[in-house]
C-alpha cells in the first residue's frame, strides 16, 4: 500500500506509536514530527519505542507521553521485553521511522490497523514486510524531510520544525546558569568524538582550535560528549595541548542540552549534539566528511557554518546514504578558523547580546 490508501489521521486519534529506537540525532529529528502530531491531535497519547541513550534526552518532554525502552544491551531479551510492553498497547497508527530489521521486528510487535513505514525502495532489510502502509517513493532528501513525508501521507499539517529541547524546569535552568556563570567569558562547546571513528576530527587539531577560541575570539572552550575510550583519549590529548579548555564529558544529554543552549558557538562533527545545537538555535560549526551533509547536515540553521569535506570541489553529489572514508583529515585548522571568523561576522553580536541578557549576574 502507498499513501493513496493511508487514511488521514483523525484529529480525535487517541493513541499513536513511534518506532525510532537508535541515535540521538534521529531522536532530535523525530521531535518536529511529534510537535505536528500533537498540534493536529491534541488528545492523542504518544508512545515512543526508544533505546536508553536517546531516551534520556526526551524523557520528561511535555509532548512525549510514554517511552517504551528497547535496551539492546540485553541482546535477544530486549525483544522479549519490548514485545511484552507492547502487548497491551493498541494504537490508532504506528509510525515506523526506522528502516532496519530490528526495528521492523519491533514494529511487528505493535497492534495497529495502520503501521506506516518507508516505501520498498528505502526500507532496508525487507523492513517493508513489517508495515501495512507505506509512504510513496521519493527522491533522496534530508532526514528531517523524510520524516515529514509521514505527516504528509496522513494529511497532518506541519510548518517550520519545532523541538522544545532546551532546559524544561527550574532545576535544569539553575544548573545551566551556575555552569555558565563559572566562566568569565562565553563558552564554546566542542563535541570531541562520535560513535564512529571515521566521523571524528583529530584531537590535536581540536587542541589548536582551543587556542584560537581562547586567544582570538575570547571564548572558553568546553569539551563535551560521553566517556567512551576514544572520547577519554581525545580529552587527554586536547587538555595536554590546550590546558585552558574545560572538560564536561559525561554530563549526560539533558545537561549537554543546557550547555549547548547557553553557548556562544558550538563545534561538532556529524553526531547527535550537532543536531541538538541546531534544534536549540545555537550557532554551530559543523565538520562533515564521512556522511552525506545533504542528507544529515544542519537542517535549517547555520548551514553557512558547515565545512563540507564529503564532496570534491564543485561536485554535485547525490543525496544518498553513501559513506566516504578518510575525508575528515581534509578539514584543516584554518578551515575551522575561517568558519569562526564567519560566525563572528554573522552571528556573534546578536548571540552574545542574548546570552548577556539571559545570564547576567
Predicted regions and their residues:
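Catalytic machinery of carbohydrate-active enzymes
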Residues: 1-361
Amino acid at each position: 500500500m502507498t499513501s493513496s490508501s493511508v487514511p488521514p489521521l483523525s484529529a480525535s486519534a487517541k493513541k499513536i506509536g513511534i518506532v525510532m529506537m537508535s541515535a540521538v540525532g534521529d531522536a532530535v529529528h523525530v521531535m518536529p514530527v511529534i510537535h505536528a502530531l500533537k498540534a493536529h491531535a491534541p488528545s492523542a497519547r504518544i508512545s515512543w519505542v526508544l533505546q536508553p541513550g536517546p531516551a534520556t534526552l526526551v524523557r520528561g518532554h511535555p509532548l512525549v507521553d510514554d517511552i517504551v525502552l528497547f535496551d539492546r544491551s540485553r541482546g535477544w531479551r530486549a525483544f522479549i521485553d519490548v514485545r511484552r510492553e507492547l502487548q497491551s498497547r493498541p494504537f490508532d497508527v504506528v509510525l515506523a521511522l526506522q528502516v532496519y530489521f530490528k526495528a521492523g521486528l519491533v514494529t511487528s510487535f505493535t497492534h495497529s490497523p495502520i503501521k506506516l513505514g518507508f516505501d520498498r525502495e528505502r526500507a532496508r532489510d525487507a523492513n517493508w514486510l513489517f508495515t501495512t502502509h507505506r509512504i510513496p517513493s521519493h527522491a533522496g532528501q534530508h532526514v528531517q524531510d523524510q520524516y515529514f513525508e509521514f505527516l504528509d501521507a496522513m494529511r497532518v499539517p506541519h510548518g517550520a520544525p519545532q523541538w522544545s529541547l532546551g532546559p524544561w524546569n527550574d532545576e535544569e535552568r539553575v544548573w545551566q546558569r551556575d555552569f555558565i556563570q563559572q566562566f568569565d567569558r562565553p563558552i564554546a562547546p566542542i563535541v570531541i568524538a562520535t560513535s564512529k571513528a571515521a566521523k571524528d576530527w583529530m584531537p590535536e587539531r581540536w587542541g589548536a582550535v582551543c587556542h584560537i577560541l581562547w586567544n582570538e575570539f575570547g571564548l572558553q572552550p568546553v569539551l563535551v560528549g560521553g566517556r567512551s575510550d576514544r572520547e577519554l583519549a581525545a580529552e587527554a590529548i586536547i587538555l595536554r595541548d590546550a590546558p585552558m579548555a574545560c572538560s564536561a564529558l559525561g554530563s549526560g544529554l539533558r545537561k549537554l542540552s543546557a550547555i549547548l543552549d547557553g553557548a556562544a558557538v558550538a563545534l561538532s562533527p556529524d553526531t547527535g549534539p550537532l543536531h541538538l545545537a541546531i534544534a536549540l538555535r545555537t550557532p554551530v560549526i559543523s565538520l562533515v566528511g564521512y556522511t552525506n551533509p545533504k542528507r544529515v547536515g544542519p537542517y535549517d540553521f547555520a548551514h553557512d557554518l558547515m565545512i563540507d569535506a564529503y564532496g570534491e570541489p564543485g561536485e554535485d553529489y547525490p543525496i544518498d546514504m553513501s559513506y566516504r572514508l578518510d575525508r575528515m583529515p581534509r578539514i584543516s585548522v584554518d578551515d575551522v578558523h575561517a568558519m569562526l571568523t564567519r560566525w563572528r561576522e554573522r552571528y556573534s553580536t546578536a548571540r552574545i547580546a542574548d546570552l548577556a541578557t539571559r545570564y547576567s549576574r
